[in-house]
Amino acid sequence: MKILRKNHPLLKIINHSFIDLPTPSNISSWWNFGSLLGVCLMIQILTGLFLAMHYTSDTTTAFSSVAHICRDVNYGWLIRYLHANGASMFFICLFIHVGRGIYYGSYVLSETWNIGIILFLTTMATAFVGYVLPWGQMSFWGATVITNLLSAIPYIGNTLVEWIWGGFSVDKATLTRFFAFHFILPFIITAFALVHLLFLHETGSNNPSGLNSDSDKIPFHPYYTIKDLLGIFLLLLALMILALFFPDVLGDPDNFTPANPLNTPAHIKPEWYFLFAYAILRSIPNKLGGVLALILSILILAAFPLLNTSKQHGLIFRPVTQAIYWTFIANLLVLTWIGGQPVEYPFTTIGQXASITYFTIIIILMPVSNIIENNIIKL
């Protein structure tokens, strides 16, 4: 068996990726989230496949088909809630994974980092089109508001919006194509995830100390397979608690009402994992400016390798940048809270301040703290 896994063309790839992979001996549980994202993706594809067998992407029957899945299909309610809450677990793991990458300086592996940003954007697109499919009130109005933002693009904006809608409003054509996108995108994510892994294994993993660990590597199996299995069991436990005890806690009550183009909900808002970006969008009074800020809130992650001037890898021995980093995390939580609040004083003012802080920390404070710490080292 040992000879086979080392020589067989297919098994050799698996062996070099998950069994004999040289791994730093000191990576902590923060490195578990990559494998947890892989598990989340598999759960989403499997549950999504079973949901797609019973779902109909037609405006007259979409809402009823989701109700039918929950009421009449064997364990349909469980599959539906695992899929809906699985998306939330996916984004929790994704945010922690990106946060760990920033904290420990993983962005210096630029190819892996940039493919990670593409994965992040693709996952957000998948979640957005998926949220439209149940065809509830918030699904319909969320789709209308977010797709309508494209009309801010000069010259081609209105044409682009109508092209995406497949008509002059969000209707049957929109739902059908969103279902098609939602079905195909997870497989594109899987392909990108493999490329992400390929580039990671070209350079090897980073580690908490930020030091070169070539002299102290251990095989991935059994040490980290066991560690990953523990993480997977904890993830599944959290997902089952969420899906069985609090299935609707992260959803929106408006989505229990079928979509009605003649009745606008009091507060249109996306799912919780988009609220930070939505708050940044809303904090700018100009439509085009808001859209640009929304896009930049994610794409600014690509600036981390460019803005990094530190002589040290990661933040483990850098107290000044650590303080700024945790301020950044707190600011993100404030943005998430503001995104779910109505557009009125004082929430708009808090949102504007938090949005300015978000970009200031990344573009100004972190690079300045790098320079300060580099000078402290020389003392």
Curated annotation (Swiss-Prot):
Its cofactor is heme b. A ubiquinone binds at H201. One of its GO terms (cellular component) is respiratory chain complex III. PROSITE patterns: CYTB_CTER, CYTB_NTER. Keywords: Electron transport, Heme, Iron, Membrane, Metal-binding, Mitochondrion, Mitochondrion inner membrane, Respiratory chain, Transmembrane, Transmembrane helix, Transport, Ubiquinone. The keyword Transmembrane helix applies. Heme b b566 binds at H97, H196. The chain crosses the membrane at residues 33-53, 77-98, 113-133, 178-198, 226-246, 288-308, 320-340, 347-367. Heme b b562 binds at H83, H182. Binds 2 heme b groups non-covalently. It is found in: Mitochondrion inner membrane. It is a multi-pass membrane protein. It holds the Pfam family Cytochrom_B_C. GO terms for biological process: mitochondrial electron transport, ubiquinol to cytochrome c. GO terms for molecular function: metal ion binding; ubiquinol-cytochrome-c reductase activity. The cytochrome bc1 complex contains 11 subunits: 3 respiratory subunits (MT-CYB, CYC1 and UQCRFS1), 2 core proteins (UQCRC1 and UQCRC2) and 6 low-molecular weight proteins (UQCRH/QCR6, UQCRB/QCR7, UQCRQ/QCR8, UQCR10/QCR9, UQCR11/QCR10 and a cleavage product of UQCRFS1). This cytochrome bc1 complex then forms a dimer. Heme 1 (or BL or b562) is low-potential and absorbs at about 562 nm, and heme 2 (or BH or b566) is high-potential and absorbs at about 566 nm. Component of the ubiquinol-cytochrome c reductase complex (complex III or cytochrome b-c1 complex) that is part of the mitochondrial respiratory chain. The b-c1 complex mediates electron transfer from ubiquinol to cytochrome c. Contributes to the generation of a proton gradient across the mitochondrial membrane that is then used for ATP synthesis. Belongs to the cytochrome b family. This is Cytochrome b. The gene is MT-CYB.
